[in-house]
Amino acid sequence: MTSAQCPALACVMSPLRFWGPWPLLMWQLLWLLVKEAQPLEWVKDPLQLTSNPLGPPEPWSSHSSHFPRESPHAPTLPADPWDFDHLGPSASSEMPAPPQESTENLVPFLDTWDSAGELPLEPEQFLASQQDLKDKLSPQERLPVSPKKLKKDPAQRWSLAEIIGIIHQLSTPQSQKQTLQNEYSSTDTPYPGSLPPELRVKSDEPPGPSEQVGPSQFHLEPETQNPETLEDIQSSSLQQEAPAQLPQLLEEEPSSMQQEAPALPPESSMESLTLPNHEVSVQPPGEDQAYYHLPNITVKPADVEVTITSEPTNETESSQAQQETPIQFPEEVEPSATQQEAPIEPPVPPMEHELSISEQQQPVQPSESSREVESSPTQQETPGQPPEHHEVTVSPPGHHQTHHLASPSVSVKPPDVQLTIAAEPSAEVGTSLVHQEATTRLSGSGNDVEPPAIQHGGPPLLPESSEEAGPLAVQQETSFQSPEPINNENPSPTQQEAAAEHPQTAEEGESSLTHQEAPAQTPEFPNVVVAQPPEHSHLTQATVQPLDLGFTITPESMTEVELSPTMKETPTQPPKKVVPQLRVYQGVTNPTPGQDQAQHPVSPSVTVQLLDLGLTITPEPTTEVGHSTPPKRTIVSPKHPEVTLPHPDQVQTQHSHLTRATVQPLDLGFTITPKSMTEVEPSTALMTTAPPPGHPEVTLPPSDKGQAQHSHLTQATVQPLDLELTITTKPTTEVKPSPTTEETSTQLPDLGLAIIPEPTTETGHSTALEKTTAPRPDRVQTLHRSLTEVTGPPTELEPAQDSLVQSESYTQNKALTAPEEHKASTSTNICELCTCGDEMLSCIDLNPEQRLRQVPVPEPNTHNGTFTILNFQGNYISYIDGNVWKAYSWTEKLILRENNLTELHKDSFEGLLSLQYLDLSCNKIQSIERHTFEPLPFLKFINLSCNVITELSFGTFQAWHGMQFLHKLILNHNPLTTVEDPYLFKLPALKYLDMGTTLVPLTTLKNILMMTVELEKLIVPSHMACCLCQFKNSIEAVCKTVKLHCNSACLTNTTHCPEEASVGNPEGAFMKVLQARKNYTSTELIIEPEEPSDSSGINLSGFGSEQLDTNDESDVTSTLSYILPYFSAVNLDVKSLLLPFIKLPTTGNSLAKIQTVGKNRQRLNRVLMGPRSIQKRHFKEVGRQSIRREQGAQASVENTAEEKRLGSPAPRELKQPHTQQGPEKLAGNAVYTKPSFTQEHKAAVSVLKPFSKGAPSTSSPAKALPQVRDRWKDLTHAISILESAKARVTNMKTSKPIVHSRKKYRFHKTRSRMTHRTPKVKKSPKVRKKSYLSRLMLSNRLPFSAAKSLINSPSQGAFSSLRDLSPQENPFLEVSAPSEHFIENNNTKDTTARNAFEENVFMENTNMPEGTISENTNYNHPPEADSAGTAFNLGPTVKQTETKWEYNNVGTDLSPEPKSFNYPLLSSPGDQFEIQLTQQLQSVIPNNNVRRLIAHVIRTLKMDCSGAHVQVTCAKLVSRTGHLMKLLSGQQEVKASKIEWDTDQWKTENYINESTEAQSEQKEKSLEFTKELPGYGYTKKLILALIVTGILTILIILLCLIEICCHRRSLQEDEEGFSRDSEAPTEEESEALP
């Protein structure tokens, strides 16, 4: 026995030893498979279109100590981060250098100013401080202009200078000083070292003649502009070669600043003007001169507050004082120093200077400047009491009068934009000197603040100080024009600006000088403003750091030459300076002694806050000189250096330029350029009214100054973020200022667009402005006009401007994604370029230059309706952006015929969910990517004719939805030779295929005949048709369903047919294909040859008339159930809203449902055969139950309605057990009874088919619908519905335990069925494997059936979260709906109806048991619909739901801009909602594609179906979606049945050999099924690994059992043998006994 047993054990163990290591190896392989099978998670990261500002520049302290002395280049702006080259000089001037740079530039002034603690300093103190600062700061530091740009691109600066009028100054690159001046922005600008040593010597001279020295210091640069010295200085002033010239100025201007830039006689000033860069003014030897320029130029990014106080001094002493205190320019000194920068230069060589100036800046102004030079002295004298300017009086007293008017001091602080413009005319020269000092100090502290503003302020002073070299010097420093005196018109930059004004100002020397001086000052900030006169206008634009303000404020002096004369007249009355400082940002004060008088009333203090974008402009009435001086001090804020804007005159010119200045789009990116609406007369009137009663705080320009500059400034306040511009204009004296204010509408709309208002003043100025205003002057004018109309408070202005701002900012946002030009042409004016109407956008028959090169994106609200037809025929579209179609989500017909498309990608049509007709004919398409048409599940027609397609590669027509509706495909007129895409042949609905005029072989025809069973008409190439016609009779005899239509040409054609052998052979492959087709299809196929005149086009007119067959309510019912079978609340409301649109009959609903169920049952009867008859019978029973439930639903509805009327809660507790039992049984049975579990899964939820078939609630009773429609109008009825629903939800909680127990029972039931079936089948171990696989499949289904059941139980988190989406989606979810809907109903009936439509669509009548609702009440989920992501409690808190709902609506309304057109970079609330919904549905709808479709449809219905004009389209979408789900479910039923009956085939073909899908139809179907199977989706490999693992586990267990059994047997046998052995002796012994 033992020996016999051993062989048996060996037999058993040997296989074990053989198979033992195998499982280990398999486990390793499985592990690798599992790792590879990790599900791919893709998350869409929304792109953010928002441009991030570079960040607010560091605050610039007004104190010089805050400025780094060590960075010589500090004043320079970083070229890369802030590239303001496009802004032009004005922009550069406007853009404050980085805080350090600007700080350095401002240092001299800040030191003098801050050290004194007041703007005005004693001449000695001022000079000393300037010298110290000069010593401390390198030339680059002193200059506010960015050295990088100036050094790197002097040419650009020259161009800027030309723009600004500094061309002449810049044009004199001869002298190194000019070069320094080029660098002055970066290096020597504050203290132009290039000025002749003479000038420096003068600056070094004792401050005794401080009055003169101050101006001369500043004038040193301008003094260099003096006709005589200017020529010398041009050659040597920068090189300090003109020291000989210094003596003249030295006498007048002994100052430390003069030492650096010794004030030159008017002659020298001329030379300084010649400096190619405003450097002359920037680099005058005298520090005071440079310092002067610095005050003008100084901009402090962080806190930029520049006050420009100019007091014209009648005497040379004033200029000296100004020299000492560069801000103050004595009339005498001023011409020399200031004139260098400004055209104030002495009249000695007026013609020469004119030439030089004009060369440097603009030749136009020489004569004017000469006149101005003369007049400037006069002006200086005339303004004997120049109104004191704000702290920073850049221009000499005379100039201040004119210049201040032209340029209010503007201080801009990127973080804090505070624009204070205070112009106070000083009656006396001494006052002007004081102002100059103060100005210089301010500029010292605020050099960086806003060089352009200061420069602006300074240059206007030049005309006044033409007599005084000192003031000119200051202005020169402030502006680039310092080299040339105004008289010489070397300050041509200034003069040019002023020149336009000078014709008028020529009479008024002061005004012209002021204009000149203002430009002169601008030179100092070449970075900010290159050209003084033009630059001043640019300066007026006060450079703002893109980070903070991003906008340039360019006030245009409304009053021009006359204005300055008027100011001259009124100079005795110093306007009270208005220095409203913005809370956080730079304050810009633009007071001018002369201008203040006339313009000061005009110049309101303008405060701009980036954050609030609120601009407050308060004009201050001009007062006497004494007042002007104190205001200066007050104006100067140590924290915010004030930037002096150009005087009105300069502002006129400069503002036009400044207006032009653009700011980087990153920040505010908008330039505000006010237009001076008032012309010379208004300015005169303003001057007359120059002393405003006080500067009323007019958010917009004050009456006086507001007219010219303030109007512009008013325009300045805009906040890109808020796009809220508040402009309040309080005219102090005249009404004109308000019009000006109105004119100065801030043009926030275009952040990147510079708005340049054109001055309405003199023609000369307007011309200059127009030139300067390269940016659309017309547009600016229009804007200004609109603003003028808005003269009212900023709030009123805001609407007009805001609309503009929003539209433009929107354009800019789009610009982020697409070129602005393209957007401007395509997005903004789409309905102007194309034809919009009747739901159609037609862009055909355009001029060649207008033709589209890419798909245009419409702006929101461009068209009130939706575009269902897009016709882009005959354009130049060569590429389709992936997200461009989001703006056309409702498009059903797209015509791209006759364009330049070369290839199609899988995302080429993303977003066209509703598209049905696609015409791509007559393009240049060569290749079509795989899955190209997958985003188009409802596509019916494709026209690809007349292209260059040579092959249809694998997957061209592949789509997860199988292209269920595609019935017409045109491929003719293509060099098509191969068709390798099996999906083309398997298109389920294809009825018309045109392959005429192609090169397809006979093999393609065979595949079509074999696989395209629904094809009704096939057009083949003529040669192939003729070959077939030769065997017409044979073919039609073999297959009666194939008909050949042969034309006369084929009958008479005897051409040899290469396919003759194959076709003619009765036993050949072709005939066999025909026989096979006859066996499995009855559809008649007509084969025709191509028509000789066959056109590649197709008439699409008939397609539009085609309508979906929606007469059967079952379509709608199933549609809704497919979309959201989970929501079973208040279904009648959904139907009452949807059915009218879908034109469903109001009767026969139950019958239709019954018929549908019957049809489904018949189909299943055909499929379910054999041992599954039990399932078939069970399904029939389920169908009958569903019908009974359907019929009983009507009674239930009626009862419910009655209960609702009575206001009593529905007695649901009694009914629930019965009601739930039906659906639960259905859901439970569906899992194991129906082979169509894939259908459930495919239909977007494990509930699809079972619920649609068994759920009576999905279709409302026929009689109930009309009643509901009638009641819907009754608000009280709607409220009662909600209340009863809420009560019902509360009552249904009791059903949860039942549901849970039922679920368990269902699982038990499933197992028991399996056990019964297994013994029944019992065949072999193979069968056992089969049964195991079947169980495995069923177990995979169980989670979904469980999901269905769990939908009813609160424990199902996934579903509950899904339900929570509904609060936003469906106020009608019984959980959250009651409160939400109730509130909305209280508001309006229409709102209720709309919401019902939007959201009830989601609720959909589901077949789910009532119990499902009960869980909803308890769910607290973060609503995924809520973009904010805040969690709220659906049921309990009414307020939360209501608020959330409102929030969603708001988000939907506001979303279009970011959502649709920014190709977002920021995902819209709709996108976020869709993503969250997709995630929530993951556990319920494992199939990724179906889940995405369902989520997208739900999102569309929720977010985009609120409008009445889209409700019909929405209803169509719902119907189509339901139809698609039905088709997919029907297909999966057959597949599922086959798979369950043939598990071996399912196992091998479905999972193991995916590549074989293209080889055989069966394998293909199996593969598709696996894709649709619940639980497989993207985890096919994982499932395969699990299956293999299960098999291995079973094998191992079996082997172990076998071994154990064998071992036991051996033990038993051993025991038996042992027992026998033990018994044997006993017998022997017994026998042995006797």
Swiss-Prot record:
Enumerate the LRR repeat regions by residue range. 137-160, 230-253, 267-290, 864-887, 888-911, 912-935, 937-959, 963-987, 1002-1027, 1124-1146, 1151-1176, 1359-1384
Membrane topology label: Single-pass type I membrane protein
Family membership, please give it: Belongs to the LRRC37A family.
Composition bias (Basic and acidic residues) maps to 1181-1191, 1201-1216
Q: Which SUPFAM superfamilies match?
A: L domain-like
**Which residue intervals are topologically Cytoplasmic?**
1603-1634
One matching Pfam family: LRR_8
Question: What protein name is recorded for this chain?
Answer: Leucine-rich repeat-containing protein 37A3
Indicate yes or no for the key word Nucleotidyltransferase: no
Q: Extract the PROSITE patterns matched here.
A: LRR
Instruction: Please state where this protein is localized.
Output: Membrane
Major localization class:
membrane
Q: What keywords are annotated for this sequence in UniProt? A: Glycoprotein, Leucine-rich repeat, Membrane, Repeat, Signal, Transmembrane, Transmembrane helix
All ranges on the Extracellular side of the membrane:
36-1581
Write out the ranges of the annotated region (Disordered).
Answer: 53-104, 129-154, 172-531, 619-642, 758-777, 1181-1227, 1306-1329, 1614-1634
Q: Which residues cross the membrane?
A: 1582-1602
Organism of derivation: Homo sapiens (Human)
Origin: domain of life: Eukaryota
**InterPro entries given in the database record:** Leu-rich_rpt, Leu-rich_rpt_typical-subtyp, LRR_dom_sf, LRRC37, LRRC37_N, LRRC37AB_C
